[in-house]
Design a protein with these regions (language model features):
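Acidic Gly/Asp/Thr-rich repetitive segments characteristic of extracellular carbohydrate-active
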Residues: 1-10
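Right-handed parallel beta-helix/beta-spiral solenoid domain characteristic of secreted/periplasmic
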Residues: 17-19, 26-71, 79-83
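Glycine-rich beta-solenoid repeat tracts in large extracellular/virion proteins
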Residues: 19-22, 40-51, 68-75, 88-96, ...
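All-beta strand scaffolds that present successive hydrophobic residues in beta-strands
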Residues: 28-31, 54-59, 76-80, 97-101, ...
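A charged, solvent-exposed segment within the mature domains of Sec-exported extracytoplasmic proteins
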Residues: 81-86, 90-97, 102-105
Length: 179
């Protein structure tokens, strides 16, 4: 299948064990729920889109006990996802940008990490997320561009460090909640 062909996956409410790599496509990966069961990944999910390809993931639980939850090498849009128990819940590597909206990050060493010197796309609004009980909620080691990361409606609670901004990237927390 051509890398220009978008791939849309509507996943059942089951647990997927082990690591998985989604290759060079535009991805739409959508979880579901059935009673108490929710689409869940317990291994690292790597997203390898190139040259402007991206991934849109929604309604998925990422449950770990170490390692990386989402390992992004492309623009990755997360919505209504939850991350629990990772060394790093979601990371934007070189060429990538990770966006999260309406997501929950709980009990991770690092919840959201940026370590990218370039990106094929940006999405700077981090609206209505909940960061609770993480070592570091947001770690910005390296991030290109001059977009302001907006955390409006997001809640930071009981993290050791809420935002570690080594890159001194512009961040707006005026409408965020700190408990």
């Amino acid at each position: 299948m051509s890398s220009e062909t978008p791939v849309y996956l509507h996943l059942p409410a089951v647990t997927y064990d082990g690591d998985i790599v989604f290759g060079n496509h535009v991805w739409g990966i959508y979880g579901s729920s059935d009673g108490d069961d929710v689409t869940t990944f317990t291994g690292t999910v790597s997203l390898r889109g190139l040259n402007g390809n991206y991934a849109d993931m929604s309604g998925i639980q990422f449950k770990g006990n170490s390692g990386i939850g989402v390992n992004a090498y492309c623009l990755t849009l997360l919505s209504q996802c939850s991350f629990d128990g990772w060394d790093t819940a979601a990371i934007a590597n070189n060429g990538a940008w990770v966006n999260a909206m309406d997501c929950t990050f709980t009990n991770n060493k690092i919840a959201l990490k940026f370590n990218s010197s370039m990106a094929y796309g940006t999405a700077p609004n981090y609206l209505n997320n909940t960061f609770t009980g993480n070592g570091t909620a947001v770690c910005i080691e390296n991030l290109p561009g001059n977009e302001v990361l907006d955390f409006a409606g997001s809640t930071f609670s009981e993290n050791d460090v809420d935002i570690d901004n080594k890159a001194e990237h512009s961040v707006d927390t005026a409408k965020a909640n700190f408990e």
